[in-house]
């Protein structure tokens, strides 16, 4: 008798836990995506939305460039080995993990 009562109330809490777990995982992924998009948005003033510039043909597009190349260039700007009007200062504001994330994000964008 006690086992039947236990078996009756057990499924609803398990379902609730499963739903909460799935929601938490989705929320964490959404937060990660939002954080990455916010980080990439800092590039939009010059390089355009999603890395496709429209206003200044002298500014290179970032969409679709290889991640390895972007990492190398950002680190060169950061170290002062590559010069540009503002990129040397801007690159200093990113840590290596953020540079890697930005490079992967823009590499995944269609040209």
Predicted regions located by residue number:
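Bacterial N-terminal signal peptides that target proteins for export
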Residues: 2-14
């Amino acid at each position: 008798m006690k086992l039947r009562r236990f078996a009756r109330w057990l499924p609803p809490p398990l379902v609730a836990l499963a739903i909460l777990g799935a929601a938490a995982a989705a929320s964490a992924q959404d937060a990660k995506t939002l954080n990455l998009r916010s980080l990439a948005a800092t590039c939009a003033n010059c390089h355009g939305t999603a890395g496709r510039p429209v206003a200044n043909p002298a500014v290179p597009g970032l969409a679709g460039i290889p991640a390895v190349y972007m990492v190398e260039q950002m680190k060169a700007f950061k170290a002062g080995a590559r010069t540009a009007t503002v990129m040397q200062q801007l690159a200093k504001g990113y840590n290596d993990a953020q540079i890697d994330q930005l490079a992967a994000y823009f590499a995944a964008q269609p040209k």
